[in-house]
A protein has these predicted regions:
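Short, flexible loop segments at boundaries between secondary-structure elements
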Residues: 181-182, 186-187, 233, 239-259
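Active-site-adjacent alpha-helix immediately C-terminal to a catalytic or transition-state-stabilizing loop
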Residues: 214, 226-241
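Hydrophobic, often amphipathic alpha-helical segments used for membrane interaction and targeting
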Residues: 50, 57-211, 231
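Generic beta-sheet signal
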Residues: 4-6, 214-220
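Short, high-confidence coil segments that cap the C-terminus of an alpha-helix
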Residues: 32, 211-214
Length: 259
Protein backbone atom coordinates (compact mmCIF):
# COMPACT_ATOMS: atom_id res chain seq x y z
CA UNK A 1 0.00 0.00 0.00
CA UNK A 2 2.01 3.01 1.23
CA UNK A 3 -0.43 5.39 -0.48
CA UNK A 4 -1.02 9.07 0.17
CA UNK A 5 -4.69 10.02 0.34
CA UNK A 6 -5.82 13.64 -0.01
CA UNK A 7 -9.34 14.62 1.08
CA UNK A 8 -10.44 17.68 -0.90
CA UNK A 9 -13.81 19.24 -0.20
CA UNK A 10 -15.57 21.18 -2.94
CA UNK A 11 -18.68 23.31 -3.42
CA UNK A 12 -19.68 21.28 -6.52
CA UNK A 13 -19.21 24.45 -8.59
CA UNK A 14 -18.06 28.06 -8.57
CA UNK A 15 -19.00 30.33 -5.68
CA UNK A 16 -17.68 33.81 -4.91
CA UNK A 17 -14.72 32.24 -3.10
CA UNK A 18 -14.42 28.68 -4.41
CA UNK A 19 -13.41 28.35 -8.05
CA UNK A 20 -13.21 25.21 -10.17
CA UNK A 21 -10.00 26.68 -11.60
CA UNK A 22 -8.45 26.54 -8.12
CA UNK A 23 -9.37 22.87 -7.80
CA UNK A 24 -7.71 22.20 -11.15
CA UNK A 25 -4.56 23.94 -9.89
CA UNK A 26 -4.58 21.70 -6.81
CA UNK A 27 -4.75 18.62 -9.03
CA UNK A 28 -1.80 19.95 -11.03
CA UNK A 29 0.16 20.44 -7.82
CA UNK A 30 -0.72 17.07 -6.26
CA UNK A 31 -0.49 15.04 -9.49
CA UNK A 32 -2.79 12.19 -8.37
CA UNK A 33 -2.57 8.71 -9.84
CA UNK A 34 -6.08 7.90 -8.59
CA UNK A 35 -9.05 10.29 -8.35
CA UNK A 36 -12.09 9.15 -6.38
CA UNK A 37 -15.26 10.81 -7.63
CA UNK A 38 -18.37 11.29 -5.48
CA UNK A 39 -20.51 9.07 -7.67
CA UNK A 40 -22.22 5.78 -6.68
CA UNK A 41 -19.93 2.77 -6.43
CA UNK A 42 -22.36 0.89 -8.69
CA UNK A 43 -22.50 3.64 -11.32
CA UNK A 44 -23.22 1.93 -14.65
CA UNK A 45 -22.14 4.89 -16.79
CA UNK A 46 -18.61 4.88 -18.27
CA UNK A 47 -16.68 7.28 -16.05
CA UNK A 48 -15.69 9.70 -18.82
CA UNK A 49 -19.31 9.95 -19.98
CA UNK A 50 -20.40 10.50 -16.38
CA UNK A 51 -17.86 13.29 -15.87
CA UNK A 52 -18.82 14.99 -19.13
CA UNK A 53 -22.49 14.81 -18.16
CA UNK A 54 -21.80 16.27 -14.71
CA UNK A 55 -19.66 19.05 -16.17
CA UNK A 56 -22.39 19.94 -18.65
CA UNK A 57 -25.05 19.89 -15.92
CA UNK A 58 -22.97 22.31 -13.82
CA UNK A 59 -21.68 24.50 -16.66
CA UNK A 60 -23.29 27.63 -15.20
CA UNK A 61 -21.03 27.13 -12.17
CA UNK A 62 -17.83 26.33 -14.00
CA UNK A 63 -18.63 22.66 -14.57
CA UNK A 64 -18.02 21.58 -10.98
CA UNK A 65 -15.24 19.20 -9.97
CA UNK A 66 -15.97 17.11 -13.07
CA UNK A 67 -14.67 19.95 -15.26
CA UNK A 68 -11.49 20.19 -13.20
CA UNK A 69 -10.92 16.44 -13.46
CA UNK A 70 -11.58 16.35 -17.21
CA UNK A 71 -9.16 19.22 -17.75
CA UNK A 72 -6.52 17.47 -15.65
CA UNK A 73 -6.95 14.28 -17.67
CA UNK A 74 -6.20 16.12 -20.91
CA UNK A 75 -2.49 16.16 -20.05
CA UNK A 76 -2.14 13.65 -17.20
CA UNK A 77 -2.79 9.97 -16.68
CA UNK A 78 -5.02 9.11 -13.74
CA UNK A 79 -7.65 6.50 -12.98
CA UNK A 80 -11.01 7.96 -11.93
CA UNK A 81 -13.18 5.71 -9.75
CA UNK A 82 -16.56 6.06 -7.96
CA UNK A 83 -16.78 5.69 -4.18
CA UNK A 84 -20.21 6.89 -2.98
CA UNK A 85 -22.80 4.53 -1.47
CA UNK A 86 -24.37 1.89 -3.69
CA UNK A 87 -27.77 2.87 -5.08
CA UNK A 88 -27.50 6.54 -4.08
CA UNK A 89 -29.26 8.09 -7.06
CA UNK A 90 -32.13 5.59 -7.13
CA UNK A 91 -32.63 6.03 -3.39
CA UNK A 92 -32.86 9.82 -3.69
CA UNK A 93 -35.41 9.46 -6.48
CA UNK A 94 -37.42 6.88 -4.55
CA UNK A 95 -37.49 8.82 -1.27
CA UNK A 96 -37.97 12.27 -2.87
CA UNK A 97 -35.83 13.85 -0.16
CA UNK A 98 -35.30 17.13 -2.00
CA UNK A 99 -39.01 17.61 -2.64
CA UNK A 100 -39.92 16.73 0.95
CA UNK A 101 -37.24 19.04 2.32
CA UNK A 102 -38.67 21.87 0.25
CA UNK A 103 -42.21 21.21 1.52
CA UNK A 104 -40.96 21.20 5.12
CA UNK A 105 -39.06 24.44 4.53
CA UNK A 106 -42.16 26.11 3.11
CA UNK A 107 -44.19 24.94 6.11
CA UNK A 108 -41.61 26.46 8.46
CA UNK A 109 -41.59 29.77 6.59
CA UNK A 110 -45.39 30.00 6.70
CA UNK A 111 -45.65 29.04 10.37
CA UNK A 112 -43.00 31.44 11.65
CA UNK A 113 -44.67 34.40 9.93
CA UNK A 114 -47.59 33.97 12.33
CA UNK A 115 -47.64 36.19 15.45
CA UNK A 116 -48.78 33.15 17.44
CA UNK A 117 -45.69 31.09 16.56
CA UNK A 118 -44.03 29.35 19.50
CA UNK A 119 -41.29 31.80 20.65
CA UNK A 120 -38.77 29.09 21.55
CA UNK A 121 -39.30 27.36 18.22
CA UNK A 122 -38.97 30.72 16.47
CA UNK A 123 -35.65 31.42 18.20
CA UNK A 124 -34.27 27.99 17.30
CA UNK A 125 -35.42 28.31 13.69
CA UNK A 126 -33.74 31.70 13.32
CA UNK A 127 -30.58 30.32 14.94
CA UNK A 128 -30.23 27.49 12.45
CA UNK A 129 -31.30 29.75 9.57
CA UNK A 130 -28.55 32.21 10.45
CA UNK A 131 -25.95 29.46 10.68
CA UNK A 132 -27.12 28.16 7.32
CA UNK A 133 -26.46 31.53 5.70
CA UNK A 134 -22.99 31.66 7.22
CA UNK A 135 -21.88 28.05 6.83
CA UNK A 136 -24.39 27.20 4.12
CA UNK A 137 -24.39 24.15 1.94
CA UNK A 138 -22.91 25.06 -1.47
CA UNK A 139 -24.11 28.66 -1.33
CA UNK A 140 -23.09 30.49 -4.51
CA UNK A 141 -22.51 33.65 -2.45
CA UNK A 142 -20.08 31.87 -0.13
CA UNK A 143 -16.81 33.83 0.01
CA UNK A 144 -14.68 31.00 1.39
CA UNK A 145 -11.87 29.77 -0.84
CA UNK A 146 -10.77 26.20 -1.53
CA UNK A 147 -8.24 26.62 1.28
CA UNK A 148 -10.90 27.92 3.69
CA UNK A 149 -13.27 24.99 3.19
CA UNK A 150 -10.39 22.52 3.39
CA UNK A 151 -9.31 23.56 6.85
CA UNK A 152 -9.85 22.26 10.40
CA UNK A 153 -11.90 25.39 11.17
CA UNK A 154 -14.42 24.67 8.42
CA UNK A 155 -14.62 21.03 9.50
CA UNK A 156 -15.59 22.13 13.02
CA UNK A 157 -18.15 24.58 11.63
CA UNK A 158 -19.78 21.92 9.44
CA UNK A 159 -19.81 19.26 12.16
CA UNK A 160 -21.37 21.74 14.60
CA UNK A 161 -23.93 22.90 12.05
CA UNK A 162 -25.03 19.37 11.17
CA UNK A 163 -25.29 18.45 14.85
CA UNK A 164 -27.45 21.52 15.47
CA UNK A 165 -29.64 20.69 12.48
CA UNK A 166 -30.42 17.36 14.10
CA UNK A 167 -31.08 18.81 17.55
CA UNK A 168 -33.00 21.91 16.46
CA UNK A 169 -35.32 19.96 14.19
CA UNK A 170 -35.90 17.40 16.93
CA UNK A 171 -37.00 20.30 19.14
CA UNK A 172 -39.18 21.81 16.40
CA UNK A 173 -41.02 18.52 15.90
CA UNK A 174 -41.77 18.51 19.62
CA UNK A 175 -42.64 22.20 20.02
CA UNK A 176 -44.79 22.60 16.90
CA UNK A 177 -47.39 19.80 16.54
CA UNK A 178 -48.02 20.52 12.85
CA UNK A 179 -44.35 19.80 12.09
CA UNK A 180 -44.50 16.27 13.49
CA UNK A 181 -45.64 14.91 10.09
CA UNK A 182 -42.15 15.68 8.72
CA UNK A 183 -40.19 13.99 11.50
CA UNK A 184 -40.01 10.49 10.03
CA UNK A 185 -38.73 11.60 6.62
CA UNK A 186 -36.24 13.98 8.23
CA UNK A 187 -34.86 11.14 10.32
CA UNK A 188 -34.56 8.89 7.27
CA UNK A 189 -32.70 11.58 5.37
CA UNK A 190 -30.20 12.27 8.16
CA UNK A 191 -29.62 8.56 8.74
CA UNK A 192 -29.06 8.00 5.03
CA UNK A 193 -26.38 10.69 4.93
CA UNK A 194 -24.68 9.01 7.91
CA UNK A 195 -24.78 5.68 6.06
CA UNK A 196 -23.32 7.40 3.02
CA UNK A 197 -20.35 8.63 5.02
CA UNK A 198 -19.69 5.15 6.40
CA UNK A 199 -19.95 3.59 2.94
CA UNK A 200 -17.60 6.21 1.50
CA UNK A 201 -15.00 5.44 4.17
CA UNK A 202 -15.28 1.71 3.54
CA UNK A 203 -14.95 2.16 -0.22
CA UNK A 204 -11.92 4.44 0.16
CA UNK A 205 -10.20 1.84 2.35
CA UNK A 206 -11.01 -0.88 -0.19
CA UNK A 207 -9.41 1.17 -2.95
CA UNK A 208 -6.41 1.82 -0.74
CA UNK A 209 -5.88 -1.94 -0.39
CA UNK A 210 -5.85 -2.35 -4.19
CA UNK A 211 -3.01 0.05 -4.92
CA UNK A 212 0.61 0.50 -3.84
CA UNK A 213 2.70 3.67 -3.68
CA UNK A 214 0.02 5.82 -5.27
CA UNK A 215 -1.23 9.34 -4.68
CA UNK A 216 -5.02 9.35 -4.34
CA UNK A 217 -7.33 12.37 -4.29
CA UNK A 218 -10.82 11.99 -2.82
CA UNK A 219 -13.18 14.70 -4.09
CA UNK A 220 -16.24 15.29 -1.92
CA UNK A 221 -18.81 17.93 -1.11
CA UNK A 222 -17.23 19.73 1.82
CA UNK A 223 -20.10 18.72 4.13
CA UNK A 224 -18.73 15.16 3.97
CA UNK A 225 -15.13 16.15 4.68
CA UNK A 226 -15.11 16.03 8.48
CA UNK A 227 -16.80 12.60 8.59
CA UNK A 228 -14.37 11.13 6.05
CA UNK A 229 -11.38 12.53 7.91
CA UNK A 230 -12.60 11.21 11.25
CA UNK A 231 -13.30 7.82 9.75
CA UNK A 232 -9.92 7.52 8.05
CA UNK A 233 -7.38 9.22 10.29
CA UNK A 234 -7.30 6.42 12.87
CA UNK A 235 -6.79 3.77 10.18
CA UNK A 236 -3.58 5.09 8.64
CA UNK A 237 -1.15 2.76 10.40
CA UNK A 238 -3.37 -0.32 10.12
CA UNK A 239 -4.12 0.18 6.42
CA UNK A 240 -0.77 1.63 5.40
CA UNK A 241 -1.54 5.10 4.08
CA UNK A 242 -0.91 8.76 4.92
CA UNK A 243 -3.88 11.13 5.09
CA UNK A 244 -3.66 14.78 4.04
CA UNK A 245 -6.69 16.97 4.69
CA UNK A 246 -5.23 20.47 5.15
CA UNK A 247 -4.22 21.84 1.75
CA UNK A 248 -2.05 24.43 3.44
CA UNK A 249 0.28 21.68 4.68
CA UNK A 250 0.36 19.52 1.55
CA UNK A 251 3.80 20.72 0.49
CA UNK A 252 5.31 19.38 3.71
CA UNK A 253 4.55 15.75 2.93
CA UNK A 254 6.80 13.72 0.61
CA UNK A 255 5.22 12.17 -2.46
CA UNK A 256 5.29 8.38 -2.91
CA UNK A 257 7.24 6.77 -5.69
CA UNK A 258 4.82 5.65 -8.37
CA UNK A 259 5.11 2.00 -9.32
Amino acid sequence: MNNIIYIIGTCHGDTIGFKVEDLYKQLLEIKPDIILDESPIDNMWPMMDWLKGCADHSKKRGGGEAAAVLRYLEDHRAEVLPYDIKGRNDYFIKMKFFEKEQVYGEACSAYFKQPSANPTAFYLFKLIEGMGRRFGFHETKDKRTIFDINSPLCDVQVETYISLIRQVNKALFSLVPEFSQYERDFGKMMNFHARRDKAMISNILNYNSRFDDKTMVVLCGYFHRYALIKGLEGSQKKHGFSLISDLGSSDKVPQPKNS
